[in-house]
Amino acid sequence: MSSLFVCPLCGGALTRREGSYLCPAGHCFDIAREGYTYLLPVNRKHSKTPGDDKAMAAARHAFLEKGYYAPLCEELCQLAVELTGDAPAVLDNGCGEGYYTAGIYRALCAAGKTPVMAGIDISKPILRLAAKREKNVQFAVASSYRLPAADGSVDLLINCFSPLAIEEFRRVLRPGGHFIYVVPGEMHLWEMKQVLYDHPYVNEVKETPYEGFRYVSIRHITDVIHLEDPADIQALFGMTPYCWKTPKAGVEKLCKLTQLDCRIAFDIHVFEKER
């Protein structure tokens, strides 16, 4: 079975055979029963359990399953279809539990394309969920800063709320390939921030140029979601960087809420690698 992945030890192409990935040099990487593999060398781990833990992964999965971020997923699916050819190689960097990954893969198939798609994330617990969500996508534990993909092998790279490893993106994308970069929009989660902070801030919207890329477009997605379950409020909070830097008083106020109407806003930047 063809694969986008390369060996993290020698860089050789990986081929999937039954329950493992093999490279020409004989390095072997087992596929877990859930369907993902582990391509993060030990010397690249910065903690014993990097990324989201099991509880965080489950909360994120439950929140996204309720469709709160469906407008973003639908727009990403449409963009992926527009930007790719008949048999695209697609990589989702920082794919999380695979909500957008699976949506994009299925949209490409529904459009009559035959994609080869892979998703990488640093968290094992969250990749267990991703691999269960879509069996036809290849998932691996790996680092954004050392992507397990060959030079110029990717047609479309998606980076949704994940680390921006622009040099690696430039390396793995083919000339003329596209890079989709999703960041929070200006008023994203404004009502939540009003609860958390005495002086909430508006997110900056900017079109940043990156060497080796042509800026193509920006799309703004906005909506209002109604959260009527305290668990959903806490799950959403846990998906944001605010959970690491909010004062205790703000967290306590949020914990007292039983419902919340909140704006969501996303900016989708599209870049093309220079030919």
Language-model-detected regions and their locations in the chain:
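N-terminal auxiliary segments of SAM/dcSAM-dependent transferases
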Residues: 1-49
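Conserved Class I S-adenosyl-L-methionine
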Residues: 3, 221-275
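Conserved beta-strand signature within the Rossmann-like core of class I S-adenosyl-L-methionine
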Residues: 177-184
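Class I SAM-dependent methyltransferase SAM/SAH-binding core
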Residues: 89-92, 96-146
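A short acidic, Gly/Pro-enriched loop at the edge of an enzyme's catalytic core
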Residues: 145-156
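Class I SAM-dependent methyltransferase Rossmann-like catalytic core
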Residues: 46, 51-75, 79
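Helix-to-beta-strand junctions that scaffold the AdoMet/dcAdoMet cofactor pocket
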Residues: 173-174
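A short SAM/SAH-binding and catalytic strip from SAM-dependent methyltransferases
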Residues: 154-168, 183
